[in-house]
């Protein structure tokens, strides 16, 4: 069951003081407002490498989180997940962004902070691995992530892989930024 504070936010949603600056930075980079086929392909790669049915490249601004890159395996169950846009207090990526560290949840129901989240209740997500996308300015823009509808052991290898994919994607983002500046 999902629980809300009187403010309408999920309980235990992290305070994100960097959201206003991140929103400006995402606009500068042209990220987080539209679907990006290159990022869809990158999400597909995340899913393949981590052998996960769902994967995404997620950017989080002041208003929402947006999966500019998203992959749903053809043989994965249709559960209403994943969606391109989610409220900031749904899912696990906002926690990765605020913590500035990767997060592995082998069974999300084992953690009170995450067990009552809407993506558990409404979409059946049971397992998550995500790593932050930290740019050259030290701003965490969003995440790369993979989820499963079954509990699973991502292990240290899965964590290392998510971090490596995040670093690779940050290099792509930097190359895009350099091309914009050279313009």
Placement of each model-derived feature along the sequence:
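Sensory beta-strand/linker motifs that couple input domains to effectors
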Residues: 137-148
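Regulatory sensory and allosteric helical modules in signal-transduction proteins
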Residues: 25, 54, 60-68, 76-126
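Juxtadomain coupling helices with adjacent low-complexity linkers
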Residues: 6-12, 16-19, 147-183
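Short regulatory/linker helices and ligand/cofactor-binding micro-motifs at input modules
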Residues: 21-37
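A short, aliphatic-rich beta-strand micro-motif
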Residues: 126-135
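PAS/LOV and related PAS-like sensory modules
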Residues: 1, 24-28, 183
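Helix-loop-beta substructure at the N-terminus of cytosolic sensory domains
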Residues: 33-68
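Residue-level recognition of short loop/turn positions
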Residues: 99, 136-137
